[in-house]
């Protein structure tokens, strides 16, 4: 008859304690680098956002009359039904022109340190003015926008309520502030990763935890950290090795166009990775459709590493855990134009 050996109590306890310690260490490491998405944003630059501003901004966000053609709205390129982006390489603008860069998601953009791939807008209010005036995008002017909105009594009343202290309520600046107020509501809390950061260890599965560890240990989190896992700082694309010209077109020098500083050539804002599984294609060029390919390219270009296939798969699984609760948006009824509203133009 075989005799059985009993595992010493200390060894038994240690065998249970080791995985728990490893789990705690992973959570502690992640908590030092990342923060969960807040449930809502109630103020901008220390000022409370009013309901009147949000509701006005929502209508303006969806109103194509802000464009010269009356065809394009903010939602055209930042579609709230498709992850806050438009899922094409570069957006189609006025007269079927194609923009030079992929449209970033509007979801959680309020948490970015600056807007656009090159950071040329300091906040969402400043960002809102850019596409409207860009001849490739909405091809309008501040004067035309003010004339359009001022010709619609319902908008005039809404601007007065949203900006009661303004000497000129219907203005291009206030339009941008209202859009910013609405866009600040477009946040996606309670992703599996958010729940994990808040203490729910079971919110991530085993593969996603492996991916999180690989993401941090490989160096991805050096650029992609904070609330948005990116969007906070600028880095050269091709820090170690330049990617193919299709991914990094030579004609787009990134932040150099803003600063005119040679060291900023091919420097871009680190892409926020929240909801990244929903916002293909990837990179400012919009030339990479598969998340696994984007991860492999970043390993080569930024880290100088040929990531192992298992690491790529695990990181992709982790990135899927960044998809949060999508905003439930009811399309607004827009006020009718009047006889004095400027007509669409080519």
Curated annotation (Swiss-Prot):
Binds 2 heme c groups covalently. Heme 1 is low-potential (-330 mV) with 2 His axial ligands and functions in the peroxidase reaction, while heme 2 is high potential (+320 mV) with His and Met axial ligands and functions to feed electrons from electron-shuttle proteins such as cytochrome c and azurin. Heme c 1 binds at residues 74, 77-78, 284. Heme c 2 binds at residues 220, 223-224, 298. Residues 1-23 form the signal peptide. Its EC number is 1.11.1.5. One of its GO terms (molecular function) is heme binding. It catalyses: 2 Fe(II)-[cytochrome c] + H2O2 + 2 H(+) = 2 Fe(III)-[cytochrome c] + 2 H2O. Keywords: Electron transport, Heme, Iron, Metal-binding, Oxidoreductase, Periplasm, Peroxidase, Signal, Transport. One of its GO terms (cellular component) is periplasmic space. It comes from the Bacteria. It is found in: Periplasm. Its cofactor is heme c. PROSITE patterns: CYTC. Binds 2 heme groups per subunit. Sequencing of the whole protein indicates about 20% starts on Val-247. Its main location: periplasm. It is an enzyme of class 1 (oxidoreductase). Catalyzes the peroxidative oxidation of azurin and cytochrome c551. Likely to provide protection against toxic peroxides. Organized into two domains, each containing a covalent c-heme in a structure reminiscent of class 1 cytochromes c. The domains are related by a quasi-twofold axis. The domain interface contains a calcium-binding site with an unusual set of ligands. This is Cytochrome c551 peroxidase. It comes from Pseudomonas aeruginosa (strain ATCC 15692 / DSM 22644 / CIP 104116 / JCM 14847 / LMG 12228 / 1C / PRS 101 / PAO1). The gene is ccpA.
